[in-house]
Amino acid sequence: MDRSPAHVGLIPDGLRRWARANGASLADAYLRGSEKVTEILLALQRNEVQTASVYNLSRANLARPDDQLEAVYAASIYFLTTLVPANFDAATCSFRMHGDRDLLPAEFVAAAEALEATMTGPDFRINLLAAYDAEDELRSAYRRAQAQECDINDAFEIGRVDMVIR
């Protein structure tokens, strides 16, 4: 490949299996996962990827048991309040959360909104998808395309992903 992909999707997967196989708690597994996501984001930024979308929590995942959700939320809040601010320059990086904020804990949403307000740089964009549903995105893109009188492919908020890392 002569150039880096413009947009990379990250799907953290296997953290529950890793916890079981290694005798670790879910909380520890999800925290390690958030640290690994941060490492990958930094590598993508160094390699001149323009946008990275982290598929954090689908709407379907919200049906998981409370102990699993609490571990995901805690690691996500750590990612938002500690890892992202410590590793990414707000003057060069931007952040945006996509999904149904009404379905997420207030602390999670507040942490994401704080990053959205402060991280507005032009060089590297981080999208976080939480309480996200692809069908909702399709419906929203369809409505935007009709309102803006444009092709539906130009109306997606996330944009086309060139490569997925799972």
Show the residue positions of the predicted features.
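Flexible, compositionally biased loop and terminal segments
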Residues: M1-R166
